[in-house]
Amino acid sequence: MNSHYLTLIMNSGALLTIIVLLPPIIMPKPSMILTTKLVKISMFISLIPLTIYLNENMETTLTMKPWMDWALFNIALSFKIDKYTVIFTPIALMITWSIMEFSQWYMAKERHMDKFFKYLLLFLITMITFISANNLLQLFIGWEGVGIMSFLLISWWSGRTKANISALQAVAYNRIGDIGLMMSMVWMCSNTNSWDLQQITMLLSDQQYLIPTLGFLIAATGKSAQFGLHPWLPAAMEGPTPVSALLHSSTMVVAGVFLLIRLHPLFQNYPLMLEMTLCLGAMTTICAALCATTQNDIKKIIAFSTSSQLGLMMVAVGLNHPHIAFLHMCTHAFFKAMLFLCSGSIIHNMNNEQDIRKFSCLNNNLPLTTTCMTIGSAALMGLPFLAGFFTKDLILEALNTSYTNAWALMVTLMAVTLTTAYSSRLIIMSASGTPRYLPLTPTHENNFIKNPLKRLAWGSLISGLILTSTLPPMKPQIFTMPTYIKTIALMMFIISLIISMELTNKKINQTTFSFFTQLAFYPHIIHRLTSHLSLIWSQKLMTQVMDVSWLEKIGPKGLANHQLKPSTTLTEAHHLNSATLPLMAFALTLITLSLTAR
């Protein structure tokens, strides 16, 4: 077929994917079933551009009439339909379809479900806008859109104080990242006179500029909850479980990593920024893995595993392998969404209980849920031939064959080991053993649970093989390496299994890991200590500086001190006059009498 027609079909399919999603947003009260069906239809439509790309290796850019057209600067509505867009869009749509179907059961008793589904749909559309943007303005619109929608969805249960605090916390931390992105946009506008991504990468890819690259790294740190700006991610678990599934799998938290992948040409020839990205990712992945190992809340364990995997993606970007980071982002979306839906099924059936120490033997009552949770955890561990294995193994191989940073290598290997440890602990505590809950606890699995979990389970099983076999690597791969490097992932898996068995051994007196259960006291230091110190300093400033200076120097005491010397002088003179006047009068009287007597 003529390439012109293929380009037309590809562009039309990409636009139709978005257009199909618009009716539920325009309608005042769309039904949940209609919204879910339209997302399903949109997912199948999005396969058309993907099929054309896989067959013809074709990428297009759809540009429309400029919004602003100045002498040296213009902004046009432009969509970049490349491999990142055509691959990630069907994945995001499929996951959203599964989450919406699951929500029809999970949140059946909630009011305003039409608004909830609108929020989910807007969340998805803003993410698609972000990944398909071909200029920084559209990218910023999608970037802010996912931030706003995450705030609305995390605070969905607005009657709960913790939900509102968590939503505000997410916004506050993301504001820091937004400052970095805006700083880079201003620099681009003033130095390149363009916000078009293709022009920017063409002009700056061979040079090193600190301000724009640092701004993009700060933006990714805030949005993807990297170390330093990470406390909002576990706090976001106060929202509904379907929100957590969408937030952690294919929307907001991966937006920061995707930003670095999209703008990687600016980083690829800048060793300093690559080193910073590598060390930041390594620090994030080890801290999150240590916290996940000591948590007992099922949703927080999965949330910290998300943070750890995001750190692993940042490591891949820092190794100058954005292609591998994108592959891991795609495979991670499937099993992370499935793990959250499994946790939602367990929580709902266990009467809103989230402590894994109170779960056990759930494989008898919730067989499909525990099976899918086992598959998702195994894929997260990197068990051979599951989705996570193909991408995790590539990251470890790239890290082992790199001469960049030995500390990052050691820390990342420790984090990968701990990933298997907390995933195995989650499976053992939930699925095996004797029941630790009431025998009359009602548990059931219906089609609203089964169908989404089955779809995501298939994605967790085969997505890694399909993606790595159909997408060629961007750089030449190393085909010869020592056996110990090739098998290091398997060795880490075995070691971590031993660690997890040790952690779940009930015969050993368990000690409280207060340091990591409290997230290394980082939220207390940042949220409590800093505010407490600022209040103390403010109090001292007002009471010991302002009040004292007013009272002692300017106010009543100051006036009294200033008037003390004159009043003392006058008083002394008054006392002097009081003592001398009678003597003078007596002397004058004597003189007068003496003169009279003569």
From Swiss-Prot:
Protein's job: Core subunit of the mitochondrial membrane respiratory chain NADH dehydrogenase (Complex I) that is believed to belong to the minimal assembly required for catalysis. Complex I functions in the transfer of electrons from NADH to the respiratory chain. The immediate electron acceptor for the enzyme is believed to be ubiquinone.
Catalytic reactions on record: a ubiquinone + NADH + 5 H(+)(in) = a ubiquinol + NAD(+) + 4 H(+)(out)
BP-aspect Gene Ontology terms: ATP synthesis coupled electron transport; electron transport coupled proton transport
Record's subcellular location: Mitochondrion inner membrane
Taxonomy of the source species: Eukaryota, Metazoa, Chordata, Craniata, Vertebrata
Official protein name in the record: NADH-ubiquinone oxidoreductase chain 5
Originating species: Petromyzon marinus
The keyword Electron transport is annotated on this UniProt entry: yes
Keywords for the protein's UniProt record, in alphabetical order: Electron transport, Membrane, Mitochondrion, Mitochondrion inner membrane, NAD, Respiratory chain, Translocase, Transmembrane, Transmembrane helix, Transport, Ubiquinone
InterPro entries, A to Z: NADH_DH_su5_C (IPR010934), NADHpl_OxRdtase_5_subgr (IPR018393), ND/Mrp_TM (IPR001750), NU5C-like (IPR003945), Proton_antipo_N (IPR001516)
